Amino acid sequence: PRSTLFPYTTLFRSLDNLVIVKNNSGAIYYPQININNIGDWNYLEGYQMYMTSPDTLFVLGSMVEPENTPITLIQGWHIIPYLRNSEMAIEYALESLENSFLIVKDNSGNIYLPAIGINSIGNMRPGQSYYIYMLYLDTLIYPEN
């Protein structure tokens, strides 16, 4: 489902430092030249944002219950949101996926590659999105808050 409460033009209005937003499919929101082929905010997707300087995005609405919010992921790369309201060790946060993914990356270049015991991400954090490479179809269900 897509949120009809938060079209990009409204959601990002307060972010003067925003340059561009990109989703997993390559669609973009580029306010300076009036391009929005993403549509409305989808809380089941993660996004990449390029800013000229740090800023805070405030979103109003109901809190998501992560344990009741499945995210279906097909084979390949995805940008996933972290739906919990507190940090959690990545191995527990992604436990519902078992062995269906190969690697997870954050926006700082850290990785989680469980097959060879690498975890430089540590905890997943609220407000962050992560790249994940799925080996096959599975459903991500985060533990409850």
Explain the meaning of each model-derived region:
Residues 1-10:
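Single conserved hydrophobic/aromatic residue that forms the stacking wall/gate
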